Amino acid sequence: MFMGEYSHTMDAKGRVFIPARFREELGEKFIVTKGLDHCLFVFPQKEWKVIEEKIKALPFTNQDARAFVRLFFAGAAECEQDKQGRVLLPNHLREYAKLDKEVVIVGVGTRVEIWSQELWNNYCNGAQAAYEEIAEKMVDFLL
């Protein structure tokens, strides 16, 4: 399970270090795609297969389902770690997530998220203020 928050610097080539705690579970090759809230979602191959099966079950006759599937898969890229544990993020994904130099890599259970430091801070400030309210809404799912 992925958990924790790690700050890293992206180099000029668009490479970022994957935290050592995440490397083995992600595997040598993994999928990076557009996430929600302008972050990137990173899935190990086995988890990607699970997501892929669920998405394939969406009705293609539903306009929202078609839009989601198109954007989710069109933005996806298979990436791999180099020997130093870095991953080169494709330019279109860096642009989508507004990644510049300072990035935050967050473990979120079955996936990893990559955020720009600025967007992560903004997100946390807003979500932290509503944390208890969000928890109350989620209590049925948690228990």
UniProtKB/Swiss-Prot annotation:
GO terms for biological process: negative regulation of DNA-templated transcription initiation. Coiled coil: none annotated. Pfam families: MraZ (PF02381). Keywords: Cytoplasm, DNA-binding, Repeat, Transcription, Transcription regulation. PROSITE patterns: SPOVT_ABRB (PS51740). InterPro entries: MraZ (IPR003444), MraZ_C (IPR035644), MraZ_dom (IPR020603), MraZ_N (IPR035642), MraZ_sf (IPR038619), SpoVT-AbrB_dom (IPR007159), SpoVT-AbrB_sf (IPR037914). CDD domains: MraZ_C, MraZ_N. It is found in: Cytoplasm, Nucleoid. It comes from the Bacteria. Residues 5-47, 76-119 form the SpoVT-AbrB domain. The keyword DNA-binding applies. One of its GO terms (molecular function) is transcription cis-regulatory region binding. GO terms for cellular component: cytoplasm; nucleoid. Belongs to the MraZ family. Forms oligomers. PANTHER family: TRANSCRIPTIONAL REGULATOR MRAZ (PTHR34701:SF1). This is Transcriptional regulator MraZ. It comes from Carboxydothermus hydrogenoformans (strain ATCC BAA-161 / DSM 6008 / Z-2901).
